[in-house]
Amino acid sequence: MAELYPSLTQCAIVATAFKILLFPAYKSTDFEVHRNWLAITHSLPVQEWYYEKTSEWTLDYPPFFAVFEWALSQLAQYVDPAMLDVQNLNYDSWQTVYFQRATVILSELVLFYALNRFIRSDPQPTKHLAHAASLSILLSPGLFIIDHIHFQYNGFLYGILVLSIVWARKQSKLLYSGIAFAVLLCLKHIYLYLAPAYFIYLLRAYCLDPKSVFRPRFGNAFKLGLSIITVFGLAFGPFVYWGQLLQLKDRLFPFSRGLCHAYWAPNVWAMYSFTDRILIPFAPKLGLPVNQDALTSVTRGLVGDTSFAILPEISKEYTFVLTLLSLILPLIKLWLRPDYYTFVGALTLCGYASFLFGWHVHEKAILLIIIPFSLIALKDRRYFSAFRPIAVAGHVSLFPLLFTAAEFPLKTVYTLLWLILFLFVFDRIAPVPERPRIFLVDRFSLLYITVSIPLILYTSLVHQLIFGLESSITPSQPLEQRIPSPVTSASHSSLRFWYRMSAKASMTP
């Protein structure tokens, strides 16, 4: 890989230096969430971790992530012991801030390692494509905004996902791929949305003969089953023994939360909410009944349901059925053609389905689409054409996470530079497909990107200048103005990729 320039290591060093400069930047309530989890796991016995509720930010990640926090707390006690006091709510000394920021960067070494393995796993003729895709993930505005300013550990988690995907490329490493994904599920359960693709792929490619489903490989099935049971046993076994499984279920799956998150993800339900608001002034003329209690209801991401004034209410069962239905064709394709590219494509479409139709979707869940899609976006120009609009819409939809004036130039300039650089490079190096592209659809993508630039400027800057700073952080105002554009783009991108995945043409290189 010596001929690939700039190298992954060089970019990682420069990016790390830049991230260190951001230590004093804005941090969200997620910073306090993770500080509180450090305190809980350090100060209390394991049996009390999922019962502690001194803070409203209770522990609601699976046990392996709690162990990860415990491991960090063993170092934190030497930096500032006060951060590990459960009663010390909203504690943010500079030592605490610097320590927690540094742990995000260090944990991202997992992603760096996984991307290195991804490049090495690619055949020599296409290694430059894998290198470009890896750089785009390493320098992702999504990880930059969510992890290094807003504050989370997504780089670490997506590193495990990428490593699992890389291992899925070779028959000899399929067992490791399944184990890595099981570990990932025990770290953060949002990746359950990707589980259907893993289940079908490992069943067809590892447990059954790829050439005939009637020839099971009992040895492989036993090894995979035993490995998965062992991973989940280590994670959840102690809590089963203590009779705390129902408590874990309530913490990990709080379905009492509303349909839409506080800062609405640009999905179908955000558009549904937007349409409901648009219909309110016309309801009397159209003779539509109005739910008066819903007129002042705007979800804030806390416990409670989203209400609609005009349109019917949406249940969590309904969102589950829609999500499942949207997965049927990609999973059938994966069953019939259990190869690497079909698998990653199915993973991406699982991300699309969960993001567009899921219950209480966080805007950060857009990375479930962008990260795996990035790994195959350069397979040919048709893949890239489907990737381009979601890359723009997905990253722009993260802007409301950083609403302070100081971070406006950071998020805007960094994201625009990334989009211009990588979309230009991807456009230049993406191979021309054997089958012709639909140029009318490509023009729609370019039109969306053109419209996005003034939309970003208005919602992030001009709106504040006209209506004042406070108005920019009200979810029902500028955020709603963004919704139709990103939702349209995300839906368009998913439909294009779904069509590409469902096509009869082979997806093997």
From Swiss-Prot:
GO terms under biological process:
dolichol-linked oligosaccharide biosynthetic process; protein N-linked glycosylation
One example of the protein's molecular function in GO is:
dolichyl pyrophosphate Glc1Man9GlcNAc2 alpha-1,3-glucosyltransferase activity
What EC number is given for this enzyme? 2.4.1.265
The highest taxon in the source lineage is Eukaryota
Keyword annotations for this protein, in alphabetical order, are: Endoplasmic reticulum, Glycosyltransferase, Membrane, Transferase, Transmembrane, Transmembrane helix
How does this protein sit in the membrane? Multi-pass membrane protein
Compartment annotation: Endoplasmic reticulum membrane
Which pathway, metabolic or otherwise, does it act in? Protein modification; protein glycosylation
Catalysed reaction, written as an equation: an alpha-D-Glc-(1->3)-alpha-D-Man-(1->2)-alpha-D-Man-(1->2)-alpha-D-Man-(1->3)-[alpha-D-Man-(1->2)-alpha-D-Man-(1->3)-[alpha-D-Man-(1->2)-alpha-D-Man-(1->6)]-alpha-D-Man-(1->6)]-beta-D-Man-(1->4)-beta-D-GlcNAc-(1->4)-alpha-D-GlcNAc-diphospho-di-trans,poly-cis-dolichol + a di-trans,poly-cis-dolichyl beta-D-glucosyl phosphate = an alpha-D-Glc-(1->3)-alpha-D-Glc-(1->3)-alpha-D-Man-(1->2)-alpha-D-Man-(1->2)-alpha-D-Man-(1->3)-[alpha-D-Man-(1->2)-alpha-D-Man-(1->3)-[alpha-D-Man-(1->2)-alpha-D-Man-(1->6)]-alpha-D-Man-(1->6)]-beta-D-Man-(1->4)-beta-D-GlcNAc-(1->4)-alpha-D-GlcNAc-diphospho-di-trans,poly-cis-dolichol + a di-trans,poly-cis-dolichyl phosphate + H(+)
Q: Which GO terms describe its cellular component?
A: endoplasmic reticulum membrane
Q: Which residues lie on this side of the membrane: Lumenal?
A: 1-3, 120-142, 200-225, 337-355, 404-405, 470-509
- Indicate the transmembrane segments per the record: 4-24, 97-119, 143-163, 179-199, 226-246, 316-336, 356-376, 383-403, 406-426, 449-469
Report whether Transmembrane shows up as a keyword of the record: yes
* Segments on the Cytoplasmic face: 25-96, 164-178, 247-315, 377-382, 427-448
Write out the function statement from the record: Dolichyl pyrophosphate Glc1Man9GlcNAc2 alpha-1,3-glucosyltransferase that operates in the biosynthetic pathway of dolichol-linked oligosaccharides, the glycan precursors employed in protein asparagine (N)-glycosylation. The assembly of dolichol-linked oligosaccharides begins on the cytosolic side of the endoplasmic reticulum membrane and finishes in its lumen. The sequential addition of sugars to dolichol pyrophosphate produces dolichol-linked oligosaccharides containing fourteen sugars, including two GlcNAcs, nine mannoses and three glucoses.
What family does the entry list? Answer: Belongs to the ALG6/ALG8 glucosyltransferase family.
Q: State the PANTHER family in the record.
A: DOLICHYL GLYCOSYLTRANSFERASE, DOLICHYL PYROPHOSPHATE GLC1MAN9GLCNAC2 ALPHA-1,3-GLUCOSYLTRANSFERASE-RELATED
According to UniProt, the name of this protein is Dolichyl pyrophosphate Glc1Man9GlcNAc2 alpha-1,3-glucosyltransferase
Source organism of this protein record:
Emericella nidulans (strain FGSC A4 / ATCC 38163 / CBS 112.46 / NRRL 194 / M139) (Aspergillus nidulans)
